[in-house]
Amino acid sequence: MKNNGEQQDLLLPKWLEWAREIQAISQTGLHFAENHYQRERFSRLIEIAADIISVHSDLDQAELVEIFNDQIGYATPRIDVRGAVFQNGKLLLVRERADGGWTMPGGWADVGDVPSTAVEREVLEEAGFEVSAQRVIGVYDANRTGPLEVFHAFKIVFLCDILGGEPRTSNETSQVGFFSRDDIPEFLSGERTR
């Protein structure tokens, strides 16, 4: 099974593509395993996937195995939602505490979330503004160069209207601001802007 041909090859290092695929096959295999032999083999493949990633990154192999073992059921990409919020022609950005970079407010959609509701919640939590998601303006494969993600994800960007609130930071954000196209900060968050 090939992943999206040549474009996929340009975005991810082969070792990460292989490790993700091994992890996903193993996770799904564990879900459907019928005996302890199958469970042992799929568990070993999870360890191999973690080994591959830990050799090529600063991530700990044992922690990766634990993270992978916490994933249950059929493996699918994760959903990350982002809010494109404008005021007087300026885009709302938040500064990440994790890496000090700027990004549109947002985060992982929770199980059971409608994506538009998830982005409304995330903008309120991270920036202090109550918004209404109007429409999807972009869906992006989060596989990019830069800091690598262990799991595959898609980003859904919503155009949002402000209903109320005021700028407020959170435990994940250290600054909130609106920026014109010419004033977008140079240091964009590698964590969530890709």
Where are these regions (language model features)?
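Nudix hydrolase/Nudix homology domain
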Residues: 2-44, 48, 101, 171-194
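General structural signal for alpha-helix termini and helix-helix connectors
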Residues: 28-32, 70, 142
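Acidic, metal-coordinating catalytic segment for phosphate/diphosphate chemistry
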Residues: 36-82
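N-terminal strand-loop-strand
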Residues: 65-104, 131, 135
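Unchanged
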Residues: 109-133, 141-194
